[in-house]
């Protein structure tokens, strides 16, 4: 089956899994692939796919010998490109950043290079062919391991290049990328091997743990539906070792094992090895399941002779025994000794070992430990320490307790000192140890036993010395210097890696880390002293840190002879952990200007002394630790030294190691960065001599001393410390602001100040960095955390100010006080203006400088006079277009803004002006009205508001009752144009929340909130039956329209500027859909009682016009009463006609009484003018044919007052008009329609005028409207003609064209009239 499954199918799964975010989706894709590609007949081929999914667990193939660096060079040869070509350099320097993408990810970098040389079509390579090619690639490495000639290495590299070249020809770039990741055994799929095993079969992980054989797992568990009986371990098959859990201190470890029998063992610093003995066949399996056959020459004979059973499995540690010092050697020499036993002393590394051995031999001769003949033959050898047994004879013992396994171990293994040892509390190493050394393993009965054993193991295991040890050490070191081997010195201390605590009743579990074994290491307890070292180089990271420096090469200073600043630095170690991402980014940003690329084999900077070892060689150097600059100032010359590098404080394991990689005599194990020392200059870093003194002081002979009674006590200032937040805790010092949820947070400076003052200080605001809501302490503290009865200083005041919530402060209040206490009004007339400056783009880029200067100047003008500049459009009150060289209109602005910001332009509060407004205001030292300079069209706001505002339900109880009476009309009323006609469409979406419109509060009256009725109640588009109106009802509704809430479509609120002591006027415009000429018959036949009730409540409610009323000006109840009273006085009782007698007498009397109580004169400065008769745009007036009735005259008089109130706004207010989008579109398409005046249109107008109220489409010679005195100049300046005598005004307040000006260029007509005119011949 694998012969037919394409590799591209597996690659597609890899790509999908790398994009998925959840592990469940990844597992599902793996399951789908296994079910799809491997059906019931192909289950035996699961191994061919899983070995590619889990390349790290495939032990049959072995090692490829190709990591990133070697793979890059082989790939360059396979592609046949020059080594100095850009692509070859890109592959070689895959970690480096710069302008490259995917830096730090070798597979992605290689895919970029391959993409330019490979096609996108797959070559149809199968999974079997891929496995065969990878087997050949691994076979070349395994065959070359038998030889060490350079020629064979070159041949091996060429053979690998040919294999990769053949794969490149049969794959595309995507498939080759995943092949390289399989070779590197790092797929980065984001799914664990445990998840893969569980998706393959529920018992797969358990079987792999005891066999470590992926093929066996795939063959035995090919049917997912059948469970497998748990298999035991077998000799010859590697077993996953049992692991230990890390603990930070002895007390926590003892709590986990409390109540159990515990054994404490020394944790050796060697290689974890399982020894499998099957007769004379010996295997040495590491924890990675690899068989280390190099240990066989030195250990096989010892194991065969001293293990008393034919078949067994031992678990232990492979170490090196130093026969000269009679101790275990330091970590790192295992492999060297194994190779020395196998190949002889031929390499340079073994030559270095010889020099070490010579120095040790001289020391041994002086202390008479060893004869000269024995030195070269028995100085160091391999030694195995077994601490557990898993198999003995023909039986697995992993299910027995640790106590029983220790007993079996003592029976099976015969210890041989320096070769084979066992680690048990009652024998083995404990018997062979010198009398003055601590035990290697003990039974712990209490926490004190554990702590004592840990201290003895880590701090007090030394080589026994004689009185002349110091002299011998000097002799040894001088001898090493004579051999030019000064990078090494002799370490007489044996510091073990830590201790292991084990439960004696526990069973041996493969791969388990559940807490039955606990490890305690010295670097978990207390690290070595912090070392202040200097950064001299950097290494690029991989993965998410790819392309950026992620690790640093640090150095030690070499002391100068003349006591001046150091001039040379030795490479010391490589460190990269310990910093957060933010700290690391800040450090790299600071050092990046001083990085210099390391172009090996060029020499490093002259300040640094390095070994040029491949593991030491950094990617970048710091040019120099210091930077001197000579400056001249008049007759004075002075030199300034600046620090280019940074000092960092590092810590590590307390054990130091000899190093061949770095130039310093010692290096550190597991170094990590503690903190950044920006406060230290470069010349104060640690020098070599001081570091050597630290090492020697820790390596000298120590004696167990009595406990120091001079340590600081916890009761120095009377307080106590608690690890847990219990009831006894009175104060808590937190590290994060999240602790504010638990209570008040106190700054640590409070403790320091209390200690300094020798008394308990009061908690002042400066000690509370996270001020809590003060409702908890209202009797002591105010809303800003200021105590009523405690004095505060400047620091307290600053803390209070810094914690104030600026959002709770009313901006209007701030502006009020700024304006009130401003010294000069000339510098605050822009107060309250938040301006967004739109920089118009320039066609010619050469004028950018001029434009930038202009923008900078207008911003300064704004801020100097109290305004604010905002960077986003949302909070802006003004949008100023800054255009220097070309005119920029609103259409250009609207098109250039993104859709998300265009909606802000429809806000009536946003003023869109040119920069001329700001310049003129600054020149006149006052804020000029924006209307003259406005660029926003008149109709933009109205149309968009009508489309975007939400509908609301009326909040008045009486109106709700009236709506119930008018339900039939609402049901049969047609919907607006463009809305779906089905009832389901209306109910599919829930009704939006009502839009509450709040008016300003006047005096002691409450602010008015009017709710607009939803669009379903719109009566402006009723059917054909509504053409027969009830004149009496209409007349009553006309009179009451100023006292009733409007129940039509949403009105558009227009707020005019406040004049003097009068309140700002708000006028509500009616949309075109509420044309009274289209109201239905049912809408006109209203009950007389209903009208009377509306009239009675006119003085108690603030309501809008009836749906059939035009757009009118909304005013307060007091103003309406005075205006109505004035109307009655002007018309008089003699002017009323017969039609007026049809009104309800009670209703009229109540209205007159209400009107006489609230009298109000017209606003000052308004003059009454008479408008000539003119038909409003294609609609013939009916007033010339039918005598106007008194009730019509009354309504016209009301409209005169409304018009006067509308037109008497601020001097520069622009007149607004409603423009229907369809109407405008038709006029643009057929301009001649604006000039047409057909009989059909007149007939339609006449027919509509018969049913319309008097204010719609009609005007008489007595139509009067007040006009502001100063409106002419302002209107002319804004581009809008001012109304004058003899002009006609529509009911919406839009000025009609002047009759003396001739025919208009574009005459506005109703789109229904246009449709009727277009369809008249049809």
UniProtKB/Swiss-Prot annotation:
Co-factor(s): Mg(2+)
InterPro entries to which the protein is assigned, alphabetical: Adenylation_DNA_ligase_IV, BRCT_dom, BRCT_dom_sf, DNA_ligase_ATP-dep_C, DNA_ligase_ATP-dep_cent, DNA_ligase_ATP-dep_CS, DNA_ligase_ATP-dep_N, DNA_ligase_IV_dom
Entry keyword annotation includes Cell membrane: no
Binding site for Mg(2+) 2: 497
Family statement: Belongs to the ATP-dependent DNA ligase family.
Biased composition (Low complexity): 1261-1288
Gene: LIG4
Cell compartment(s), UniProt: Nucleus
Protein name, entry field: Putative DNA ligase 4
Residues annotated to bind Mg(2+) 1: 317
Record field: compositional bias (Basic and acidic residues): 957-969, 1007-1022, 1033-1047, 1082-1104, 1125-1161, 1190-1204
GO molecular function, one term: metal ion binding
Residue ranges with Basic residues bias: 970-979, 994-1005, 1051-1063
GO BP term, pick one: DNA recombination
Domain spans labelled BRCT: 686-768, 825-935
Highest taxon above the source species: Eukaryota
One Pfam family in the UniProt entry: DNA_ligase_A_C
């Amino acid at each position: 089956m694998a012969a037919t499954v394409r590799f591209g199918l597996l690659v597609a799964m890899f790509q999908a899994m790398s994009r998925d975010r959840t592990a469940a989706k990844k597992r599902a894709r793996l399951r789908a692939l296994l079910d799809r590609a491997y059906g019931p007949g192909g289950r035996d081929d699961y191994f061919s796919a899983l070995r590619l999914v889990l390349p790290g667990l495939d032990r049959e193939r072995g090692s490829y010998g190709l990591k990133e660096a070697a793979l890059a060079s082989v790939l360059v040869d396979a592609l046949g490109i020059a080594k100095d070509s850009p692509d070859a350099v890109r592959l070689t320097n895959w970690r480096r950043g710069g302008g490259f993408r995917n830096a730090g990810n070798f597979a992605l970098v290689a895919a970029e290079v391959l993409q330019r040389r490979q096609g996108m079509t797959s070559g149809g390579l199968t999974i079997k062919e891929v496995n065969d090619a990878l087997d050949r690639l691994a076979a070349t490495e395994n065959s070359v391991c038998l030889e060490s000639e350079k020629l064979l290495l070159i041949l091996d590299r060429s053979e690998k290049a040919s294999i990769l070249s053949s794969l490149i020809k049969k794959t595309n770039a995507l498939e080759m990328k995943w092949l390289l990741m399989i070779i590197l055994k790092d797929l980065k799929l984001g799914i664990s091997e445990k998840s893969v095993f569980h998706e393959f079969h529920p018992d797969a992980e358990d079987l792999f743990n005891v066999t470590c054989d992926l093929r066996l797992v795939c063959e035995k568990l090919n049917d997912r539906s059948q469970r497998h009986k748990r298999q035991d371990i077998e000799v010859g098959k590697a077993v996953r070792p049992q692991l230990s859990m890390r603990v930070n201190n002895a007390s926590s470890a003892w709590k986990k094992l409390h109540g159990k029998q515990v054994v404490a063992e020394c944790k050796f610093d060697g290689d974890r090895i399982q020894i499998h003995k099957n007769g004379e066949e010996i295997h040495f399996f590491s924890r990675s399941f690899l068989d280390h056959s190099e240990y066989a020459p030195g250990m096989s004979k010892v194991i065969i002779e001293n293990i008393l059973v034919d078949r067994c499995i031992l678990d232990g540690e492979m170490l090196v025994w130093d026969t000269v010092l009679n101790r275990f050697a330091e970590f790192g020499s295992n492999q060297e000794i194994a190779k020395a036993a196998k190949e002889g002393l031929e390499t340079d590394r073994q030559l270095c070992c010889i020099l070490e051995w010579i120095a040790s031999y001289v020391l041994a001769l002086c202390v008479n430990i060893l004869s000269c003949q024995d030195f070269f033959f028995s100085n160091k050898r391999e030694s195995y320490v077994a601490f557990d047994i898993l198999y003995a004879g023909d039986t697995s013992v992993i299910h027995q307790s640790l106590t029983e396994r220790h007993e079996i171990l003592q029976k099976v293994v015969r210890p041989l000192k320096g070769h084979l040892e066992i680690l048990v509390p009652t024998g083995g190493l404990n018997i062979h140890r010198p009398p003055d050394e601590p035990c290697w393993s003990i039974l712990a009965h209490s926490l004190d036993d554990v702590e004592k054993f840990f201290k003895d193991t880590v701090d007090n295991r030394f080589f026994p010395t004689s009185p002349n040890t110091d002299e011998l050490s000097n002799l040894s070191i001088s001898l090493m210097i004579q051999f030019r081997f000064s990078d090494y010195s002799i370490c007489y201390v044996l510091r073990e890696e830590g201790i292991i605590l084990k439960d004696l009743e526990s069973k041996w579990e493969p791969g388990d880390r559940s807490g039955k074994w606990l490890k305690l290491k010295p670097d978990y307890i207390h690290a070595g002293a912090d070392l202040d070292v200097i950064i001299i180089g950097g290494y690029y990271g991989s993965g998410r840190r790819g392309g950026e420096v992620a690790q640093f090469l640090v150095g030690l200073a070499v002391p100068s002879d003349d006591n001046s600043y150091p001039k040379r630095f030795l490479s010391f170690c490589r460190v990269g952990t310990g910093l957060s991402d933010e700290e690391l980014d800040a450090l790299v940003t600071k050092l990046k200007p001083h990085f210099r690329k390391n172009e090996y084999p060029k020499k490093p900077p002259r300040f640094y002394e390095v070994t040029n070892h491949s593991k030491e060689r950094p990617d970048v150097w710091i040019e120099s630790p210091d930077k001197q600059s000579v400056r001249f100032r008049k007759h004075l010359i002075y030199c300034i030294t600046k620090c280019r590098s940074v000092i960092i404080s590092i810590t590590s394991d307390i054990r130091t190691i000899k190093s061949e990689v770095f130039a310093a005599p010692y290096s550190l194990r597991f170094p990590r960065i503690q903190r950044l020392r920006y406060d230290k200059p470069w010349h104060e870093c640690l020098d070599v001599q001081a570091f050597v003194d630290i090492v020697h002081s820790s390596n000298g002979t120590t004696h167990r001393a009595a406990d120091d009674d001079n340590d600081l006590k916890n009761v120095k200032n009377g307080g106590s410390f608690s690890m847990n937040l219990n009831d006894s805790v009175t104060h808590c010092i937190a590290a994060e602001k999240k602790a504010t949820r638990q209570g008040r947070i106190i700054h640590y400076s409070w403790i320091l100040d209390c200690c300094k003052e020798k008394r308990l200080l009061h908690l002042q605001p400066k000690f509370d960095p996270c001020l809590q809501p003060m409702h908890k302490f209202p009797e002591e503290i105010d809303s800003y955390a200021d105590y009523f009865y405690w004095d505060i200083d400047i620091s307290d005041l600053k803390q209070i100010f810094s914690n104030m919530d600026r959002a709770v402060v009313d901006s209007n209040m701030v502006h009020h006080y700024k304006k009130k206490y401003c010294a000069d009004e000339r510098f605050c007339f822009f107060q309250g203006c938040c301006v967004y400056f739109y920089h118009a783009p320039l066609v010619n880029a050469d004028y950018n400088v001029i434009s930038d200067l202009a923008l900078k100047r207008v911003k300064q003008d704004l801020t100097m006079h109290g305004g604010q500049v905002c960077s986003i459009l949302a909070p802006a009150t003004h949008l100023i277009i800054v255009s220097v060289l070309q005119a920029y209109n609103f259409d250009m602005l609207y098109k250039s803004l993104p859709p998300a910001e265009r909606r802000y332009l429809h806000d009536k509060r946003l003023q869109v002006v040119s920069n001329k407004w700001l310049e003129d205001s600054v020149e006149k030292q006052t804020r000029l009205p924006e209307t003259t300079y406005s660029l926003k069209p008149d109709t933009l706001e109205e149309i968009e508001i009508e489309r975007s505002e939400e509908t609301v339900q009326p909040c008045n109880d009486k109106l709700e009752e009236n709506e119930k009476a008018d339900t039939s009309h609402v049901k049969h009323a047609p919907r607006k144009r463009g809305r779906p006609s089905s009832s389901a469409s209306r109910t599919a979406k829930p009704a939006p929340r009502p839009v509450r419109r709040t008016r300003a509060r006047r005096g002691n009256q409450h602010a008015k909130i009017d709710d607009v009725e939803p669009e379903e109640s719109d009566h402006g588009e009723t059917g054909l039956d509504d053409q027969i109106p009830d004149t009496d009802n209409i007349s009553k509704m006309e009179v009451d329209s100023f006292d009733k809430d409007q129940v039509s479509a949403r009105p558009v609120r227009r707020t005019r500027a406040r004049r003097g002591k009068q309140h700002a006027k708000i006028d509500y415009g009616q949309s075109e859909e509420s044309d009274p000429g289209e109201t239905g018959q049912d809408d006109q036949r209203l009950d007389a009682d209903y009208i009377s009730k509306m009239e009675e409540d006119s003085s108690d409610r603030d309501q809008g016009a009836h749906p059939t009323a035009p757009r009118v000006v909304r005013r307060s109840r007091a103003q309406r009463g005075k205006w109505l009273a004035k109307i009655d006085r002007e018309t008089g009782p003699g002017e009323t006609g017969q039609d007026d007698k049809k009104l309800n007498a009670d209703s009229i009397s109540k209205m007159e009484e209400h009107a006489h109580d609230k009298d109000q004169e017209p606003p000052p400065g308004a003059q009454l003018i008479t408008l000539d008769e003119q038909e409003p745009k294609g609609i013939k007036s009916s007033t010339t044919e039918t005598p106007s009735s008194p009730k019509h005259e009354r309504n016209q008089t009301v409209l005169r007052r409304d018009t006067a109130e509308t037109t008497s706004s601020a001097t520069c207010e622009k007149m607004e008009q409603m423009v229907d989008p369809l109407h405008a579109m038709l006029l643009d398409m057929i301009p001649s329609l604006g000039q047409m005046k057909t009989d059909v249109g007149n007939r339609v107008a006449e027919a509509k005028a018969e049913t319309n109220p008097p204010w719609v489409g009609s005007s008489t010679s007595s139509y009067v409207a007040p006009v502001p005195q100063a409106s002419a100049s302002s209107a002319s300046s804004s581009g809008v003609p001012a109304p004058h005598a003899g002009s006609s005004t529509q009911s919406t307040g839009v000025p009609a064209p002047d009759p003396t000006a001739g025919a208009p260029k574009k005459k506005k007509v109703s789109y229904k009239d246009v449709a009727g005119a277009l369809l008249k011949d049809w």
